[in-house]
Amino acid sequence: MKVSSHAMVPTHEIIPREEIPLLLEKYNIKLQQLPKLLDTDPLVLEVEAAPGDVLKITRMSPTAGESTYYRLVIATSL
């Protein structure tokens, strides 16, 4: 089963690497300040993201409209 096919799961997409500096500049942050998402997360696996990738997550809300947020994919440490 594809996790992304569930109605409650927001859209996840990988941001092209060349756009990451623009995102960081826009929000005046460093890459490591982004919230993290493990590389073992089912949606990370589904979109084939790798550690170092940034995911753009877009959620629809009946009250807030469209909400976009970003997560940095990190490797799982043992």
From Swiss-Prot:
An example Gene Ontology molecular-function term: DNA-directed RNA polymerase activity
Catalyzed reaction equations: RNA(n) + a ribonucleoside 5'-triphosphate = RNA(n+1) + diphosphate
Keyword terms of this UniProt record: Cytoplasm, DNA-directed RNA polymerase, Nucleotidyltransferase, Transcription, Transferase
Compartment annotation: Cytoplasm
Any Pfam family the entry gives: RNA_pol_Rpb5_C
EC number: 2.7.7.6
Record GO cellular component, one term: cytoplasm
InterPro entries, sorted: Arch_Rpo5/euc_Rpb5, RNA_pol_subH/Rpb5_C, RPB5-like_sf
BP GO annotations: transcription by RNA polymerase II; transcription elongation by RNA polymerase I; tRNA transcription by RNA polymerase III
HAMAP family per UniProt: RNApol_Rpo5_RPB5
Subunit annotation: Part of the RNA polymerase complex.
Family, per entry: Belongs to the archaeal Rpo5/eukaryotic RPB5 RNA polymerase subunit family.
Function: DNA-dependent RNA polymerase (RNAP) catalyzes the transcription of DNA into RNA using the four ribonucleoside triphosphates as substrates.
Protein name: DNA-directed RNA polymerase subunit Rpo5
Encoding gene per record: rpo5
